[in-house]
Amino acid sequence: MAPGGPFMRIIIGGGGRVGSGLAKALRSEDKEVVLVDNNARVVKNAQGMDILVIYGDVTKRNKFIEAGIDSAEVYVASTDSDELNLLSCALAKHVHAEKTDGKGNLTTICRLRNPHFVEEHKSGKLGQWAGVDHVVHPIDDAIDRLMSGLRSSSLSEVIPFEADAYIVELDVRSEASNVVHRTLRESGAKVEGGLPLIVGLKRDGNQGKVPTADDILLPNDRVAVATAGEASFNRILRILGHEAVDFPEKPKVIIFGASLIGTRLAKAWQRTGASVTVVERDLQLANNMAGSDIGDLPGIEIIHGDHLDKELLSEIEISSMDIAISALDNDHGSIAAVLLAMDMGVERTGLILYDADLVSVVRRMGITFSVDRRRVAIDAMLSRIHSELPGPYAVLSSVPDVVGICLPVTDRVKFVGKTIADAGLPEWCKVAFIQRKNIHDEWETLRPSSSKNLLEGDKLTIFLPPYRVYDLERKFKV
């Protein structure tokens, strides 16, 4: 079983955007949450969340005792400081062991930015000297979301779910004549090839929900759609009333900034066959990238220069680029860089942002797609907290009252060999994907149908209200 059930105690060190967002998500699952922070404003803001809030320093032993570390099952270090997070994880482990006479078990989850510490974790050494069980370093996940989201200007969110499975979030437009003012069942009969699988529905003024076949779609509804393969995005867009534009097979990509994120972005795009140009105004950073293994990769050009220099951008023919992405350390600087690229003719633009509030703002500016790295971090933390589960955990941004979890079909459940229709799954949840290993021992994503049999070893991605997560975990005996 996932640790502790609905009333497990989780202590969060750091109540900034990540810590408070995590606390809110966990309370929606009825978890017992304690938040510790030494910022009076943060503590005051958190007091309306129905959690225990403690003003204090997470490097102080007495604050962990006050937070009830002896009865806690998870400690999450979510401050903006790597060093503080590492130190607090080590202290939390020590105090917990001391208070339980070494008989308890505390899982520690540490948010980190420095890739050196991430490598320490991969080698297994970080757990030995810092007491860290899981590390959250969501840059690669953020890059995956950004690369998928840039395929269309109409998608508000893209969440990868392993084995080429995706959740895409978008609005329903009035032009979607086959689906608006119809039930999902009626729309399925009207749409050639069937209606895409909608797993979340949000209407202004109403709570988000997992829709049933009798729910009606209206213009401006926000929906979350389960699909397999990025090639399916355009079909979803057309059915829901959006214009679909083909994505270039080998795009030309310009990246502003040779930071850690810029470096990872360049590698990721190069692996897809794209040609990549990186512009970096800091000579040392530009030289560092050029002298690294990235500088030797085919299809990557690194230029030392100012990303706001119109003359330079004209010289490198920025108008011929398919995509412009800014990877600067400052959100406002990144926004300025891609807006200039838009003015100079680049149609698709992307950002990885620190400030969640800017995500909707930049969309109104016409920027194609942006990713809130803090939200990606929260999803990663939730996955680690539900560490008994075999796959990702995601909160839908457009439909915040619905979450997606991945659950295993084992020999312990009663519905092995049965169809989805006969499995007796509750009506408040919906299966988005079946993932199954093929003859090559590789995971494949299958579209669920009521007649498809569930086999031992399958993984089901299921969407449901967050307060029902524990109920479903019990049904799957995890």
Name each model feature, range by range.
Residues M1-V478:
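Cytosolic regulatory regions of ion transport systems
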